[in-house]
C-alpha cells in the first residue's frame, strides 16, 4: 500500500541490533554489583610530564618513593685499647698527685698544696682551650690562668674558709674573657656560641681551688683523701673496662661502654668505704656516701666530655691537639669532683 514506507518504521532500533557502546543495565532495574575491577581495552600510558610541586617540599612523582635508596648506617667508632689504657694511667697519676698533695697541707702550710693545685689548673687550661678552641684562644687562656692564681691566693689568704672569694674570682675571670673576645671584630660573631665553652673553662679552673678551701676546714684533708681516691679509682676502672669490654655501647660515635661507667662508680664507692674504716672521723657508711657522689660525678663528667668531642667531630670541626683532647676527660672529672667533695663535707660531715 505504501511502497515508500520502510518496514522498520515503528520498531525500536535497539531491539535487534546491540549498541556499539558499552552495554548498560536494563531499563527499570538497578545496576548489578561489581565483582572486580573494570577491564580496560588499552593500558594506561605511563605518565611523563613535569613533576608536581608539593607544598613545602620539592616536586616528585608518585613512583619516586621506590627509587629512594635506604640510608647507610654509620659504622661505630672503634675503641682503641692503647689509648684507653693511656688515659686510665693519666687519671690514676692525677688522682695520686692530688691525694698526696693534700697530705702536705697543714695549719700555716697551705702553699705547697696550692702550688700543686695550680699546676693541675694549668693542665686544665691547656687541655680545655685547645680542645674547645673558643674565640681569642690566647686571651681566654691567659685570663683563665690569671683567674687560677687569684682563686688560689684567695683560698689561702682569706680569713674565713669559704667559697665567696672563689665566686668573685670566677665572675671577674668570665667577664674579662668575654670582653677580650669582643675586642676583636673577627671573634665577635662567635662570642655568643662560645659563651658556654668559656664559662666551662673559667669555672673549671676555679673549681680546683675548692680543694684548697676544703683543706682548711676540720676533716677536710680526710674528705679530700676519700673523695679524690673514689674519683680516681672510678676513672681508672672505667677506662680499663672500656679497653677490655666496651659493652654495651652508649652511642656509635662515642667509644665508651656503659659497663665501664657503672663498674667504675661501684668500685670507687667500695674503695671509699674501705678508706672510711681507717680514717679518723669517718665510718664506712659516711665514707661510702661521700665517695659515691664523687665517683659518679667524675665518671659522668668524663663521659660528657666524650659526647662533646663526638659532637664537634660530627659538626665538621677539625680535630685538635691529640694530647689535649684525651687529657680533657680526666681533668674535667676531677674538676667536678672537687666542689662535690666540698659540698658533701660541709653538708653531711
What are these regions, as identified by a protein language model?
Residues 135-146, 165-168, 189-201, 251-263, ...:
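Cytoplasmic-side transmembrane-helix entry/capping segments in multi-pass membrane proteins
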Amino acid at each position: 500500500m505504501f511502497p515508500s514506507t520502510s518496514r522498520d518504521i515503528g520498531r525500536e532500533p535497539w531491539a535487534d541490533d546491540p549498541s556499539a557502546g558499552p552495554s548498560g543495565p536494563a531499563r527499570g532495574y538497578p545496576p548489578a554489583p561489581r565483582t572486580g575491577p573494570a577491564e580496560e581495552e588499552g593500558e594506561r600510558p605511563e605518565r611523563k610530564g613535569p613533576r608536581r610541586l608539593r607544598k613545602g617540599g620539592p616536586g616528585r612523582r608518585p613512583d619516586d618513593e621506590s627509587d629512594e635508596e635506604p640510608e647507610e648506617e654509620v659504622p661505630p667508632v672503634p675503641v682503641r685499647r692503647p689509648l684507653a689504657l693511656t688515659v686510665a694511667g693519666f687519671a690514676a697519676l692525677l688522682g695520686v698527685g692530688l691525694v698526696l698533695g693534700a697530705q702536705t697541707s697543714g695549719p700555716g702550710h697551705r702553699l705547697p698544696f696550692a702550688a700543686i693545685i695550680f699546676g693541675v689548673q694549668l693542665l686544665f687550661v691547656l687541655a680545655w682551650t685547645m680542645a674547645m678552641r673558643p674565640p681569642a684562644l690566647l686571651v681566654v687562656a691567659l685570663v683563665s690562668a690569671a683567674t687560677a692564681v687569684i682563686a688560689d691566693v684567695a683560698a689561702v689568704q682569706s680569713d674565713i674558709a669559704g667559697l665567696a672569694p672563689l665566686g668573685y674570682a670566677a665572675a671577674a675571670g668570665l667577664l674579662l674573657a668575654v670582653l677580650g673576645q669582643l675586642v676583636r671584630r673577627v671573634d665577635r660573631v662567635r662570642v655568643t656560641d662560645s659563651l658556654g665553652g668559656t664559662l666551662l673553662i673559667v669555672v673549671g679552673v676555679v673549681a680546683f681551688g675548692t680543694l684548697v678551701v676544703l683543706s682548711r676546714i676540720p676533716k677536710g684533708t680526710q674528705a679530700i683523701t676519700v673523695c679524690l681516691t673514689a674519683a680516681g679509682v672510678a676513672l681508672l676502672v672505667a677506662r680499663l673496662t672500656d679497653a677490655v669490654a666496651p659493652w654495651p655501647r652508649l652511642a656509635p660515635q662515642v667509644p665508651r661502654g656503659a659497663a665501664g661507667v657503672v663498674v667504675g662508680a661501684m668500685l670507687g664507692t667500695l674503695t671509699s668505704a674501705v678508706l672510711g674504716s681507717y680514717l679518723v672521723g669517718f665510718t664506712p657508711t659516711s665514707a661510702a656516701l661521700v665517695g659515691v657522689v664523687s665517683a659518679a660525678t667524675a665518671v659522668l663528667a668524663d663521659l660528657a666530655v666524650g659526647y662533646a668531642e663526638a659532637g664537634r667531630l660530627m659538626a665538621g670541626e677539625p680535630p685538635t691537639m691529640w694530647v689535649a683532647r684525651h687529657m680533657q676527660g680526666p681533668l674535667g672529672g676531677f674538676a667536678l669532683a672537687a666542689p662535690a667533695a666540698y659540698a658533701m663535707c660541709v653538708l653531711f660531715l
